[in-house]
């Protein structure tokens, strides 16, 4: 369908640039942690980790930018794909081989998305709860809940 565009977008050179950009953005995303002072050793998880009580506004921003916005964008995209599939279902000639492979790929990507949401939701929702009232909420979160949400 778009093979010429694909070859141009994902050439060896562009793929290397995408990887470099990904690593640069990842490194850039850690810089605010050092400015806010939100990285501290947490003996509950035996690791240097993001301290949700360091700054409420920063915690909310992290949850929004790193969890809720990606979750919303991907949910919107899946909803659009699903509505398009339902809308054109009757107009497309059935091809069992292509249809099965496409459905399997779609479901695999959807499962990865659901696993992302399920794995990261507890830690992010705990972060939002702590950001609302750090002094009251943080001490009341059971240690087992924090540790299991971290891993």
From Swiss-Prot:
Gene3D superfamilies: Rhodopsin 7-helix transmembrane proteins (1.20.1070.10). InterPro entries: GPCR_Rhodpsn, GPCR_Rhodpsn_7TM, Melatonin_rcpt. The keyword Ligase does not apply. The keyword Ion transport does not apply. GO terms for molecular function: melatonin receptor activity. Pfam families: 7tm_1. It is found in: Cell membrane. GO terms for cellular component: plasma membrane. It is a multi-pass membrane protein. The chain crosses the membrane at residues 14-34, 59-79, 110-130, 144-151. Residues 1-13, 80-109 are cytoplasmic. Residues 35-58, 131-143 are extracellular. Keywords: Cell membrane, G-protein coupled receptor, Membrane, Receptor, Transducer, Transmembrane, Transmembrane helix. Belongs to the G-protein coupled receptor 1 family. High affinity receptor for melatonin. The activity of this receptor is mediated by pertussis toxin sensitive G proteins that inhibits adenylate cyclase activity. This is Melatonin receptor type 1C. It comes from Danio rerio (Zebrafish). The lineage of its organism: Eukaryota, Metazoa, Chordata, Craniata, Vertebrata.
């Amino acid at each position: 369908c778009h093979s010429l565009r694909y070859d141009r977008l994902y050439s060896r050179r562009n793929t290397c640039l995408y990887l470099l950009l990904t690593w640069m953005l990842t490194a850039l995303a850690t810089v605010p942690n050092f400015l806010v002072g939100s990285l501290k050793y947490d003996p509950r998880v035996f690791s240097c980790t993001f301290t949700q009580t360091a700054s409420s506004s920063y915690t909310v921003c992290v949850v929004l930018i790193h969890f809720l916005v990606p979750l919303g964008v991907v949910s919107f995209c899946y909803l659009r794909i699903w509505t398009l599939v339902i809308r054109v279902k009757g107009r497309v000639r059935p091809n069992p081989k292509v249809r099965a492979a496409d459905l399997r790929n779609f479901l695999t990507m959807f499962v990865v998305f659901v696993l992302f949401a399920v794995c990261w939701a507890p830690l992010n929702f705990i972060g939002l709860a702590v950001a609302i009232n750090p002094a009251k909420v943080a001490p009341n979160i059971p240690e087992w809940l924090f540790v299991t949400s971290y891993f």
